[in-house]
Each structure stands twice: as C-alpha cells, then as structure tokens.
From Swiss-Prot:
It holds the Pfam family Glycos_transf_4. This is Phospho-N-acetylmuramoyl-pentapeptide-transferase. GO terms for molecular function: metal ion binding; phospho-N-acetylmuramoyl-pentapeptide-transferase activity; UDP-N-acetylmuramoyl-L-alanyl-D-glutamyl-meso-2,6-diaminopimelyl-D-alanyl-D-alanine:undecaprenyl-phosphate transferase activity. InterPro entries: Glycosyl_transferase_4, PNAcMuramoyl-5peptid_Trfase, PNAcMuramoyl-5peptid_Trfase_CS. GO terms for biological process: cell division; cell wall organization; peptidoglycan biosynthetic process; regulation of cell shape. It is a multi-pass membrane protein. Its cofactor is Mg(2+). It is an enzyme of class 2 (transferase). Its EC number is 2.7.8.13. It catalyses: UDP-N-acetyl-alpha-D-muramoyl-L-alanyl-gamma-D-glutamyl-meso-2,6-diaminopimeloyl-D-alanyl-D-alanine + di-trans,octa-cis-undecaprenyl phosphate = di-trans,octa-cis-undecaprenyl diphospho-N-acetyl-alpha-D-muramoyl-L-alanyl-D-glutamyl-meso-2,6-diaminopimeloyl-D-alanyl-D-alanine + UMP. Signal peptide: none annotated.
Length: 360
C-alpha cells in the first residue's frame, strides 16, 4: 500500500523514492510488525483470559507443565495479524509471491484456529480430527503448488537447487507440485510439534525467517545470484519484506511467550508460521536448505516418527517422551536450558545453511 503510494507520489515528491527501496521497507517491516505485536499482546492476553481460553495440558506430560494449565493460548492470532498488516503496508502487492505466502499462512491459520477452538472452548483435547486437519492442509498446499507450477512452469522457478553442487539444478516438472506439497505440509506440522515449551518454536522460526530473508534478497538480485550460482528469480526479492515482518512479529510475540510464558501461540500460530516458512523456501528454490536451517523442527518430527514406529513395531519406546524436547525435560533438564540450547542449535544451523550458498 505504502509502496504503491510512494510510486504514485515520487514523480512530484522525490522524497517518497525512499519508500520504494527494499532495504528501507525491510527495516520498516521489522519495526512495524514488532510494534504491532507489542501493542496487541496485552490486549489479546486480557481478552483471552476474559474468555477463559487457556492451554490444555496432558496429564501424562512432565509435571512442570501442570503449572501452564490455563495459560492463555491462541496468541498466534496477534502474530498473523501483525504480519498481515505489515505486509499490506510495506510490500509490493502486485507481486504474486506475497499473496501465495499470505494465502498459505492465513489458510493454515484458519485450520489451526478451528483446532484450538475445539480444544479450549469445546474442551475436546484432540481438537480438530487429524484426518480433517491434514485434508484442509493438503487442499491449501496443493492449490498453491499447482498455481505456482503454472506460474513458473519450465523455468528456473521449478528447478531443484542442490546444495554444494552449482551445476545440479534438475527441472522438476510435475514433481514440483509433489515436492511443494510435502515441504509446506511437512514444515507446518514440524513447527507445530516443536511448539511445546515457552519460546521454543518462535525463536527458531524468527531465525529461519531471517535466513530466508537473505536468500530471498540474493535470489532476487541478478548479480548476487550469478555470484552464488543460484537461480535468479526477480519476484523473490519482495519476500525479504515479508520475511522481516515474520521476524518482527515473532520477536514481539516472544516478549510475552518467553519463560514463564504469559501466552502460547497455539495451532493457529504454529501451523500458519510453518506453512509460511515452507512456502517461502519453495519460492526461493531452497527446500533442501530449509531442512538444514530448520534442523530443530526436523529433529522434533523425526523423534515422533521414531517413537511411534518403535512402539508399534517393537512395543518399546526410544525416548522417555516425544517430541524430543520432552525427553530432555524428563531427564531433568530445566525448561529454559532445553529452550536456549535448541535456539543455539538453530542459530548454528542457519549460519551453516547460509555458508553452503558459497560452498559450491
């Protein structure tokens, strides 16, 4: 909106050219989303408390979690609101990639909202039936995947970029739709599984979004893309502004979600943010780097798969409890130690992933 306004006024008022610069809009995006989150936080928390929308805690979980029972949840609403408002203000709304990410994020947000609503309002601990949750996640992901495939068919936008190999970029064809589906749905559910401790999911999300912001800028810059031997995709640079909005909104939410949390994001936040990260990774053609950057999300998901598989096949559990962050809690690690160590791991993985852009 502001980008369009600046474009309209710039011929008469050269000062407005500043609002067209990507770096300026990225900085303003962080600040806008951060301020909006900080402003909305106390108001949303008070409203959730008034409506008695509190966290449901499993009876078989760590005893330290019993004190979390009743803590306001569905705080992801303020994250999504801050990101959406910021995107509408500071991005170029003629860019189709912006709308693709927002569509997935808000669509998954609705799925998560229904899931949370059934848990906390209808007192149904299972929330939305799993098959319906995956059905709607799949519908949204497949619609976006098909639309993106038709938009970039047989171009660099549908190639697979393989880390460490500068000349290995196979054209995916229809496999692009399959890959996109699994990346979006998989990342969404991985972030959802990680969201089990105060601040555990939001800070890695912020870090990965920051890493994706750099990749989006590099991919959208013809000279830098050539220097790094990655595909040049002109529309991706605008994703920098959206990524920084995620960073700002996430940091604002962390203000209230840090240990001991005043609010949890709920599925409305975790499913939506995971879906957004997956979509961004697809758009910048770095799905494999997302696996590295989001290593904590991958680790949490794999721990659940191994736990369930081992119990069904052998009747034995590998971990004391899954996802794996609960395993460390039951080993006696204080919650803040688990959280901060997972943050440090994520920071290392994001830096490693960015370094691979040059190691080719």
């Amino acid at each position: 909106m502001i980008y369009w306004l600046a474009d309209l006024l710039e011929p008469s008022y050269p000062f407005f050219r500043l609002f067209e610069y990507l770096t300026f809009r990225a900085i303003m995006s962080v600040l806008t989303a951060l301020i909006l989150s900080l402003w909305m936080g106390p108001r949303l928390i008070a409203r959730l408390q008034m409506l008695q929308i509190g966290q449901v805690v499993r009876n078989d979980g760590p005893e330290s979690h019993f004190s979390k029972r009743g803590t306001p949840t569905m705080g992801g609403i303020m994250i999504l609101a801050a990101i959406t408002i910021t995107a509408l203000l500071w991005t170029d709304l003629s860019n189709p990639y912006i709308w693709a990410v927002l569509a997935v994020m808000l669509g998954y947000g609705v799925v998560g909202f229904v899931d949370d609503y059934r848990k906390v309002v209808h007192k149904n601990s299972d929330g939305l039936i799993a098959r319906w949750k995956y059905f709607w996640q799949s519908v949204i992901a497949l619609v976006i995947a098909f639309a993106l495939y038709m938009h970039g068919k047989d171009t660099a936008a549908t190639q697979l970029v393989v880390p460490f190999f500068k000349d290995v970029m196979p054209q995916l064809g229809l496999l692009y739709i399959v890959l996109t589906y699994f990346v979006i749905v998989g990342t969404s559910n991985a972030v959802n599984l990680t969201d089990g401790l105060d601040g555990l999911a939001i800070m890695p999300t912020v870090m990965v979004a920051g890493g994706m912001a750099f990749i989006a800028w590099a991919t959208g810059n013809v000279n830098f893309a050539e220097y790094l031997h990655i595909p040049y995709l002109k529309d991706t640079s605008e994703l920098v502004v959206l990524c920084t909005a995620i960073v700002g909104a996430g940091l604002g939410f962390l203000w209230f979600n840090t240990y001991p949390a005043q609010v949890f994001m709920g599925d409305v936040g975790s499913l939506a943010l995971g879906g957004a990260l997956g979509t961004i990774a697809v758009l910048v053609r770095q799905e494999l780097l997302l696996v590295i950057m989001g290593g904590v999300f991958v680790m949490e998901t794999v721990s659940v798969i191994l736990q369930v598989g081992s119990y069904k096949l052998r009747g034995q559990r590998i971990f004391r409890m899954a996802p794996i962050h609960h395993h460390y809690e039951l080993k006696g690690w204080p919650e803040p130690r688990v959280i901060v160590r997972f943050w440090i791991i994520t920071l290392m993985l994001v830096l490693i992933a960015l370094a691979t852009l040059k190691v080719r």
